[in-house]
Amino acid sequence: MRMTVVKHVMLTLICGTLSWGVQINTLAYASAIKSEDGFDMDEDGVYGDDIQDYINAAYTHERPFIQDKSKHKMETYTQSLLHTDLETDSQISRERGNYINAQELGDGNNEHVDLVNRTMTKNVLMKHGHRNFMDASILYKSVHGITHLHAHQRPTEVSVAENQQLLLKVHIPQENEHTYTERWSFLPAAPCKLTPPSIQQVCIKHGACIHDVVVDVDCIAESMEHTLVEIGYVVHASKAVHPTWTVVNITEDFANYGFDTPDVKPGVLKFEHMNAHHAGVYIWNLQGTHGENMYVTFLVKLNNSIENHIDLPAVTPKPKGAEFHTWHYHSHVFSVGETFSLPMHLQYKIHDTPFDLLLEWLYVPINPTCQPMRLYSACVYHETVPSCLSPENPECTFASPHIARRVANTVYQNCEHVNYTADCLAVSHVEPGSGLEIQNGGSALLFVNAAESMSGLYVFIIHFNGHVETVAYTVVSTIENFVNAIEEHGFPPEIHNVPSPSSPNVTANNDVISETNTFPFKTYAGITGGFAVLALVCLALALVCTKRKFGHRSYWSDKAAYGQSTYYAGVPVDDFEDDTEVEVDEGAECGGSGYTVYIDKRTR
């Protein structure tokens, strides 16, 4: 059982995992042939015996012989298998074993492998239902190159009242004459009094989440996983024998926990009297001599009001916002006078409608002496951080978008369709004289008769409802001026010795004012001070009036970009410092963020 510590709050026990311990990326050379006439069908209509014979025989023959024959004989077997029903467990087990063993002989023909696996899956599911679903899945998953089959299931939560019986039970495999070893491990909850273990949704990445047992990182050192009991047994071939298994060994380790000896048999762990010491995480692991490897996890809680406990179905929260992913090249070399396209291939899922979308292209020239150029993507999300506005070595740095050139952008406002490029109105703008054109709804740039001066670092930014969602970049240059570019995820070093605009340089005056000249000076200072106070009061009143009219955010306007319409882009602010109430004029919309795209509808 592998554990991973999650930052600050959790340790994830990756559980409910089924791994058969065999690599079946390709099930090759199962078509090792007996004769040019193909395989001999047995009485059940299955060619398994012939295949197994020649899989075994292949170890004593030259591999090229097997490879040459398999290419044109595999089809005979697979086409026949399409019309063959696997009626019994023994046939299914035998066929699966044949193909698992076959993988050791080579890479095989993937097209035929696909056909065999889909046929096996169909037969198993139709004839044997849920119990053999994993048998079928193993064959199907192999087609897609999955080395191990991991079946993530939600851990089971068990609440038991004090002094009541605690029974944990798992369905065990019934493969005839197979030997299995089971291990029950225990992670006590007692050391985690403030934050006991719980079942939570754990996300490996956006949209890829599983339910797992989460243990607070602060109590991991005190609450370690220990083996409680280990049991080995053999499954009998005849179901007439009861029980259908024989225990061959059992080891126990309960002394450290003060447990009474439980009732243990294959797939079962039972305590007669539940108490606080029994609460925690129980992990059942089964390993077999044929590569089986299964995990099941239980979260056991002490509940003094078990009669009032109601298991509610898990509620998966509805995804919000949007997801954008880009595929692109990080460099493009061109010749002067060439016309070419610079695309950003987008894959996206939009969960909230209506929405505002801004696709913009920014540009900074490249300096051939910079090796490399550096893009600080954190500055795209935090445009006004001082080190982003005044980065060290600015000629070789892309930091805040405020100090870059916006060469093109496309705006989709109040769009109610997920397919925004086809169903929503777009407003695009390209910097005049740039030699650029917008393509693919704003996600690509067309360079027309590209000049040397168009070489630069082009940064593509997607804003969804005013928030930056994706940042991508490409260096476009001639071969003579090519430089590499790398993305840094922190903030750039700030340039040193930059005079602050709010602190002008003042030269000290060492002249001494005589006592006789102090009266005119005081009079002048009093008059000047009075005017200054009056000016400050007027300025404060003007700011209050302006704030009430336009809200607490400032906006810049570029009427030339859209003709009669006015395009507004939010000036970023610190949301933690500015918590005043937003007032928006009637007829306009604001997304409520320092990075919000804001378009006045009345001017459209």
From Swiss-Prot:
It is found in: Virion membrane; Host cell membrane; Host cell junction; Host Golgi apparatus membrane. Residues 1-24 form the signal peptide. Residues 192-219 are annotated as: Interaction with gI. A motif (Internalization motif) lies at residues 568-571. One of its GO terms (cellular component) is virion membrane. Gene3D superfamilies: Immunoglobulins. Glycans are attached at residues 117, 249, 303, 419, 505. Residues 25-526 are virion surface. Phosphorylated within the acidic cluster. Phosphorylation determines whether endocytosed viral gE traffics to the trans-Golgi network or recycles to the cell membrane. Disulfide bonds join 370-396, 379-388, 415-424. Keywords: Disulfide bond, Glycoprotein, Host cell junction, Host cell membrane, Host endosome, Host Golgi apparatus, Host membrane, Membrane, Signal, Transmembrane, Transmembrane helix, Viral envelope protein, Virion. InterPro entries: Herpes_gE_N, Herpes_glycopE_Fc, Ig-like_dom_sf, Ig-like_fold. The keyword Transmembrane applies. Residues 574-586 are annotated as: Acidic. Pfam families: Herpes_gE, Herpes_gE_N. It is a single-pass type I membrane protein; Single-pass membrane protein. Belongs to the alphaherpesvirinae glycoprotein E family. Interacts with gI. In epithelial cells, the heterodimer gE/gI is required for the cell-to-cell spread of the virus, by sorting nascent virions to cell junctions. Once the virus reaches the cell junctions, virus particles can spread to adjacent cells extremely rapidly through interactions with cellular receptors that accumulate at these junctions. Implicated in basolateral spread in polarized cells. In neuronal cells, gE/gI is essential for the anterograde spread of the infection throughout the host nervous system. This is Envelope glycoprotein E. It comes from Cercopithecine herpesvirus 9 (strain DHV) (CeHV-9).
